[in-house]
Amino acid sequence: FDWPCHGEDVKPRFTLADCDTYLTAVLEYARERFAPESISFNGTSFGGYAVLKYMHEHGSPFDSVVLRCPAVNLHEIFTGLYLTENDLDKLRRGKDAVVGFEKKFKINRQFLDSLAENDIMQYDFSAFADSMLIMHGTRDETVPIDAVRRFAEKNDLMLIEINGADHMFKDPARMSEYVNDTVDFIFS
């Protein structure tokens, strides 16, 4: 599935509430359509943030969770990396800012405020330690590995650092390492 404003989704404005609604719908669909014995989640970057927020609010419906380069400090990433001073000024004046990589979408001040209010770094995920694996590239240019190290340590989560991998794991050897570790973790 695609998160709101990602992939084939047609929503023009990004909200965290929509992410929660979409993930709930996907889980309900999977349960009704396939009646799986177990459900695993594999998310990258924002997908990692969104599932962590979901787990904090609803508990974990997953037997295993694998996160690659999770954006655990998303508010900081938006304000320090994605948004320009011009974007931040627009948001302060109540206007939308347009963000995104391949696909552009709108955010408003409420979205940025909701990121600050939902600071994943402040939540306790230690209850999920046995069912969660984080993998992160040591050369990630988008989500600082230091933030993820602090998050993993605080919550006693397993973190595998993939030497030389960037945020997108563009190197096929690094991606292969990630895929193999993911499969091993989910099926162990």
Annotate each language-model stretch with its function.
Residues 13-32:
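Alpha/beta-hydrolase active-site loop
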Residues 1-10:
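Conserved alpha/beta-hydrolase
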Residues 30-37, 127-128:
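Glycine-rich phosphate-binding loop signature in dinucleotide/nucleotide-binding domains
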Residues 61-150, 154-161, 166-185:
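The alpha/beta-hydrolase serine catalytic core
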Residues 31, 186-188:
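Short, hydrophobic alpha-helical segments
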Residues 53-57, 150:
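Active-site signature of alpha/beta-hydrolase-fold catalytic machinery across serine-
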Residues 43-51:
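Gly/Ala-rich beta-loop-alpha elbow adjacent to hydrolase catalytic centers
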Residues 33, 58-59:
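Alpha-helix termination/capping residues and helix-transition junctions
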